Amino acid sequence: MAPTKPSFQQDPSRRERITAQHPLPNQSECRKIYRYDGIYCESTYQNLQALRKEKSRDAARSRRGKENFEFYELAKLLPLPAAITSQLDKASIIRLTISYLKMRDFANQGDPPWNLRMEGPPPNTSVKVIGAQRRRSPSALAIEVFEAHLGSHILQSLDGFVFALNQEGKFLYISETVSIYLGLSQVELTGSSVFDYVHPGDHVEMAEQLGMKLPPGRGLLSQGTAEDGASSASSSSQSETPEPVESTSPSLLTTDNTLERSFFIRMKSTLTKRGVHIKSSGYKVIHITGRLRLRVSLSHGRTVPSQIMGLVVVAHALPPPTINEVRIDCHMFVTRVNMDLNIIYCENRISDYMDLTPVDIVGKRCYHFIHAEDVEGIRHSHLDLLNKGQCVTKYYRWMQKNGGYIWIQSSATIAINAKNANEKNIIWVNYLLSNPEYKDTPMDIAQLPHLPEKTSESSETSDSESDSKDTSGITEDNENSKSDEKGNQSENSEDPEPDRKKSGNACDNDMNCNDDGHSSSNPDSRDSDDSFEHSDFENPKAGEDGFGALGAMQIKVERYVESESDLRLQNCESLTSDSAKDSDSAGEAGAQASSKHQKRKKRRKRQKGGSASRRRLSSASSPGGLDAGLVEPPRLLSSPNSASVLKIKTEISEPINFDNDSSIWNYPPNREISRNESPYSMTKPPSSEHFPSPQGGGGGGGGGGGLHVAIPDSVLTPPGADGAAARKTQFGASATAALAPVASDPLSPPLSASPRDKHPGNGGGGGGGGGGAGGGGPSASNSLLYTGDLEALQRLQAGNVVLPLVHRVTGTLAATSTAAQRVYTTGTIRYAPAEVTLAMQSNLLPNAHAVNFVDVNSPGFGLDPKTPMEMLYHHVHRLNMSGPFGGAVSAASLTQMPAGNVFTTAEGLFSTLPFPVYSNGIHAAQTLERKED
């Protein structure tokens, strides 16, 4: 039997050897392990824990590596550049991925779907056929290259940025151009809530536009913090995020009007400087224009409500509210108004585009010149301006002085006096968008011409009397036998003797009575008769003095006599004294004996004769004078002077789109012009003669009065008077009712060189040719084409300076043509310029030759050295050679900017403005530094 091995307690040397190898700092920490050969201590608790931690770290490192690899693989799938995705953290990758997936659902499930183009090949197509089609397609490479950068090109062309919100108000997508206008990152905004970047005072409005409802108390909190401009919207908690509202009225979501959105909000911006914005520091006013997107309804029933998926928006940042950055452009003028829109200053340039002067509008409120249908929109813009400091109005109509309106869009900014903070005013910049429309058509009581009071009453009364009748003169030749019988009965049953007794005073006072028939049973007609009797006494004198302005406005409408009072008015018209009253019965007997055709001939003749013929007829003291007037119509139209003052008989149908009970809309010029411009016009010009071009101050159509009446065929005079009647049918100075001359196409009238008509001083019917100056002489404003114009354009284009605006040139150079067709660009709202330094480096700007006016006027440039500086400046603006943004101009000299395509002008060219003028160019570095100082 082999000897046993001594135990651990029996062998002290062995115990010391094990202790030296494994020191035991504390006996309680030692673990006893039983082995087959005895009990001994192998390791400590700390060593075992270290081994376990190391193994756990290795497993976690391996797991994180695999996780990061998957995250980075997911980041590569995001539609972002690799330089951005490689720097994203995991949370951003997940946030962007969720937003991208929601955006795909937003695009595919919305109405209409955005996946119109098929992503894959058509079914049952082999791979070989697909490859052959790609190789055979000549435009496959061009389309691939073009569409690869199409989105970025569109975003760069926009004067703003684009984003899409879901129904919760989170950014599903926002373009990278947001960094140019707000200084914020696309990665930072995508997937975040829009309420974290909107001013607290605008949270309620933003939620309403999205169709959301705020939690209880959220609106009051926003209103309280709206007054504090420095408060931040990012401090709002997640519980305060607005909740989507359930659509309870699906009918309201089906019309396009309720889906369109246009409003102003203030968003965070890191580009704004302290003290620049008045209402809120660190925020920019953004103009939001977009449309709500609905989910595609799979059910055909109309009871299924439409669910709002979100909002698609194009955002424009308004320029900072600094008074010294008003950019001067063509077809615009600047006004300064106080806080209640009372005009306190206006540029003199307003008279170049309208028939108003600064004296006419200073001291009045803007609401005085705004069309009645546009007042509500201006009121909303006024409220936005007071709450947010800036706004851009919708398109509205600015009423003219003599009738009509011009379409305008305005940009308003509140400016505070640096010396007196309590003094505030508004810079109101107006951009003209159209020509004057509905010229000489009064649409407001302020547009009525300044006529003598009694004459104005006469014309309005005669028109209201004509409206009170059920039948008009247009049914004169086609009336039925029943109305003939009624007319004969009324004529045969009347007694001339009581008429002389009743209307004796009226015949003594009236020199020129109305031809219209009046019903004795109509109280309105009797009231109008009284005013007519008091007002017509001064008509002959007015016709002699200023008939060029008044003759065409007195429009008479003739109807059949139905009562004794009607014939009494007709008798008063031909009798002027007591001796003439005695011959009244004989005149009536002769009229009754004549046929119906002779009566119609008499009515036409009396309307054509005007006031001159009326005075001639009234001078007769016997019935023979009246009969002589009936059988000799051509004699009254022999002299041109008498023809120019004739009153015109017209056939007036029911007015279109006008209230018959309103005295303003019943004004004769308005009724006539609306009738001539209606698609179912009852009048037409004679086909035997062409339309002469408007010439002279008194050339037809009423001369300087501005109202031109077309004569119908049914009331034309006999062939002997066609020449005199044709002179009255020409279309005059109205831009909307004017026809082109014979040389041009009447279906496509040429555009003018500017969106306004020429001054009437150049000719009586100025602007009738569409593009030339008024009258028949050469255009004075046509000097925009200076000497060597074509060579100058070729030199500018060859020097890579600018691509000139294309316009049609008729003839050799169109220097002698007065009706040359041109293309002009109207002024538009200029939003805030993009920060060029954020979009590209300074050395990446396009290489182009900066043009200075001194260099352009030099002999080496090839232009006429005698060309005026102002003319050259306007010509440069017409060619659209200036850059898109405003650059500063030194008042001392013409400084050349470092960036290309910049034109600089001296402030002396616009000395009428009370503030510095900035031309269109890219902001330079020294300009920004000077603004900060």
Curated annotation (Swiss-Prot):
Basic residues bias (residue ranges): 596-617
Q: What's the domain of life for this entry? A: Eukaryota
The transmembrane residues are: none
InterPro entries from the UniProt entry: bHLH_dom (IPR011598), HLH_DNA-bd_sf (IPR036638), PAS (IPR000014), PAS-like_dom_sf (IPR035965), PAS_fold (IPR013767), PAS_fold_3 (IPR013655)
Q: Which residues form the PAC domain?
A: 363-406
The record's disease note says: A chromosomal aberration involving NPAS3 is found in a family with schizophrenia. Translocation t(9;14)(q34;q13).
Q: What is this protein called?
A: Neuronal PAS domain-containing protein 3
Q: Which organism is it from?
A: Homo sapiens (Human)
Q: Which gene encodes it?
A: NPAS3
